[in-house]
Amino acid sequence: MAQQTPLYEQHTLCGARMVDFHGWMMPLHYGSQIDEHHAVRTDAGMFDVSHMTIVDLRGSRTREFLRYLLANDVAKLTKSGKALYSGMLNASGGVIDDLIVYYFTEDFFRLVVNSATREKDLSWITQHAEPFGIEITVRDDLSMIAVQGPNAQAKAATLFNDAQRQAVEGMKPFFGVQAGDLFIATTGYTGEAGYEIALPNEKAADFWRALVEAGVKPCGLGARDTLRLEAGMNLYGQEMDETISPLAANMGWTIAWEPADRDFIGREALEVQREHGTEKLVGLVMTEKGVLRNELPVRFTDAQGNQHEGIITSGTFSPTLGYSIALARVLEGIGETAIVQIRNREMSVKVTKPVFVRNGKAVA
């Protein structure tokens, strides 16, 4: 039986169509995925992300442990509340999960990991934390609401008390602060400004209702997917998994190669991959009628005249742009155009960087 978040009843009251998402009953949409998408791009929308797993790590060797566990380097985190995006890799350099790590004090860090990978993540973290003497607390007592869009922070702030408003004033992206009952972070999965707010389960429903009254539109998984794809953000299980290198998933920027003597899980394999080359993630744009879909083959001819085939990892119709976009994993050497076969038609697509929309504006 699928689990329910503490906001399940609120979703049904808001008219949600509920679906099973990796063992959780979650809203797909509340009537119109397109309207929800546009609300986030132009005003403010919110998502129940309580299915995500929050893991608190404590102990004097926590930083040392995370420098070994993660491909990115938490040595970069020197200011309390600062967050870092990283892959957590296996020994062969595949991605076990992508996550966000927050630094609070030398002996207190927080991870936010994906719901679909919860059990294997917790097992992996626990296994490798043992020699470092880390105390691991899974925060199942917390719900999480993501409020996203150009007006999201202002609308959310109407629910904050004076101390909370002061705590977030001037807070830069990728920071988090505990202010009273709320953990407020300037993170998100849409390419827009906003907050991800963790709060006690018993307070989540009232907070959700207050956000609705403040003019924040409830949004489901459908809009969350089109928004993240427009922003060029990876979805675990599509752009990357345990068999895919971060170098082939546009995550090379999250690998901290320096200092060269830092040993992290997967480093040796990544260094070989870096030397020999890997596939890469690109963007595809198709302005003709039709929709680029997951797992369609992408064919192209390189400069030497050799033919190659890649694959679409995520594809959709972009509500913001009004045409189809996709992320695709291909070999190096792809040019400015490629061919995608949709049913029995060969469609020409433009090859771009793997990002399409930033702050509501087209970049592709």
Curated annotation (Swiss-Prot):
<dbReference type="InterPro" id="IPR022903">
    <property type="entry name" value="GCS_T_bac"/>
</dbReference>
<comment type="function">
    <text>The glycine cleavage system catalyzes the degradation of glycine.</text>
</comment>
<dbReference type="Pfam" id="PF08669">
    <property type="entry name" value="GCV_T_C"/>
</dbReference>
<dbReference type="GO" id="GO:0004047">
    <property type="term" value="F:aminomethyltransferase activity"/>
</dbReference>
<dbReference type="InterPro" id="IPR028896">
    <property type="entry name" value="GcvT/YgfZ/DmdA"/>
</dbReference>
<dbReference type="GO" id="GO:0019464">
    <property type="term" value="P:glycine decarboxylation via glycine cleavage system"/>
</dbReference>
<dbReference type="GO" id="GO:0005829">
    <property type="term" value="C:cytosol"/>
</dbReference>
<dbReference type="GO" id="GO:0008483">
    <property type="term" value="F:transaminase activity"/>
</dbReference>
<comment type="similarity">
    <text>Belongs to the GcvT family.</text>
</comment>
<dbReference type="InterPro" id="IPR013977">
    <property type="entry name" value="GCST_C"/>
</dbReference>
<dbReference type="InterPro" id="IPR029043">
    <property type="entry name" value="GcvT/YgfZ_C"/>
</dbReference>
<dbReference type="Pfam" id="PF01571">
    <property type="entry name" value="GCV_T"/>
</dbReference>
<keyword id="KW-0032">Aminotransferase</keyword>
<protein>
    <recommendedName>
        <fullName>Aminomethyltransferase</fullName>
        <ecNumber>2.1.2.10</ecNumber>
    </recommendedName>
</protein>
<dbReference type="InterPro" id="IPR027266">
    <property type="entry name" value="TrmE/GcvT_dom1"/>
</dbReference>
<comment type="subunit">
    <text>The glycine cleavage system is composed of four proteins: P, T, L and H.</text>
</comment>
<dbReference type="InterPro" id="IPR006222">
    <property type="entry name" value="GCV_T_N"/>
</dbReference>
<dbReference type="InterPro" id="IPR006223">
    <property type="entry name" value="GCS_T"/>
</dbReference>
<keyword id="KW-0808">Transferase</keyword>
<dbReference type="GO" id="GO:0005960">
    <property type="term" value="C:glycine cleavage complex"/>
</dbReference>
